[in-house]
């Protein structure tokens, strides 16, 4: 995502940037993300020019697009979306999403959506993992080329983004919720400053 932040817009927006190798991958709240061999790591740079509450909806757009893309390779019933930005495969974490934004005033002028996917086999010995990592290849026995997955994901993101623009966020929320993990259960949500516990509805 560091490279994506320095993108000067020469090739327009939105624009995908893919890393063939990551050395400082990270997740929410500064957590490390172990990028295993054959893993997919890419960022989408956008200029939404909208309030932060609207820009944040792209987290759900990305999650829905990511699940759609993964469902091409594995049984869709094995995939669920975990609040706020992970995708689980057979109960293990296969993908994560990270949003970073900047802007002036109340508007977000630039939004970077970082996406990491274990396309190969799951990394080993991941400390303090809430959900054990799983790789797509653990189920399929084959590693999807990162270039191929980018084409699939970019097409799915464009389709879900179009749905957001044309039909509104309610439709995106409905799609996300239909595949949400732990719906109706007690969950704990943590931010940089606070921890909230309650029923996930």
Regions found by a protein language model. Give the residues of each.
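N-terminal lobe of the biotin/lipoate ligase/transferase fold
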Residues: 1-76, 143
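Long, positively charged amphipathic alpha-helical accessory segments at protein N-termini or as interdomain linkers
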Residues: 2, 52, 56-78, 89-201
């Amino acid at each position: 995502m560091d490279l994506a932040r320095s993108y000067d817009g020469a090739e327009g927006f939105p624009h995908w940037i893919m890393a063939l190798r990551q050395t400082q991958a990270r997740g929410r709240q500064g957590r490390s993300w172990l990028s295993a061999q054959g893993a997919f790591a890419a960022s989408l740079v956008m200029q939404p020019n909208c309030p932060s509450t609207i820009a944040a909806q792209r987290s759900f757009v990305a999650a829905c697009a990511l699940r759609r893309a993964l469902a091409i390779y594995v049984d869709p019933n094995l995939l669920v979306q975990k609040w706020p930005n992970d995708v689980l495969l057979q109960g293990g974490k296969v993908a994560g999403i990270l949003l970073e934004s900047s802007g002036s005033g109340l508007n977000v002028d630039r939004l970077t959506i970082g996406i990491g996917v274990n396309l190969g086999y799951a990394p080993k010995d991941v400390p303090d993992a809430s959900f054990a990592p799983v790789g797509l290849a653990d189920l399929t026995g084959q590693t999807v080329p990162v270039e191929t997955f980018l084409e699939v994901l970019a097409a799915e993101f464009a389709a879900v983004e179009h749905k957001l623009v044309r039909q509104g966020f309610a439709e995106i929320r409905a799609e996300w919720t239909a595949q949400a993990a732990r719906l109706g259960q007690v969950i704990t949500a943590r931010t940089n400053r606070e921890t909230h516990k309650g029923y996930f509805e």
